[in-house]
Amino acid sequence: MIFLIVDIRHEPSEDDCLMYEYLKHYNIPTTIIATKADKIGKTLIPRHIKVIKNKLNLSVNDKIVPFSSETKYGLEEVFFRFYLL
């Protein structure tokens, strides 16, 4: 499992997209950690997650976890994903 870190406030960059395509090409399970979730507010998180999913053309087997190091939002989900390794 690979953890790909993106900024939830922005669309994934070309490099983010390229890295995700590389991981999918080699069938590597991936979790997207969308950081800085505290900067946009909880009500906007689903909208930003949808943008990331669409831009990356996210596989149904992969997951996006909104995360904030400031508020610890999403920390349990990240720990759970690490535990699954």
Regions found by a protein language model. Give the residues of each.
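Conserved Switch II/interswitch segment of TRAFAC-class P-loop GTPases
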Residues: 1-17, 27-32, 37-44
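Charged helix-capping and loop-helix junction motifs
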Residues: 14-21, 47-51
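Conserved catalytic network of the ASCE P-loop NTPase/AAA+ motor domain
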Residues: 22-26, 58
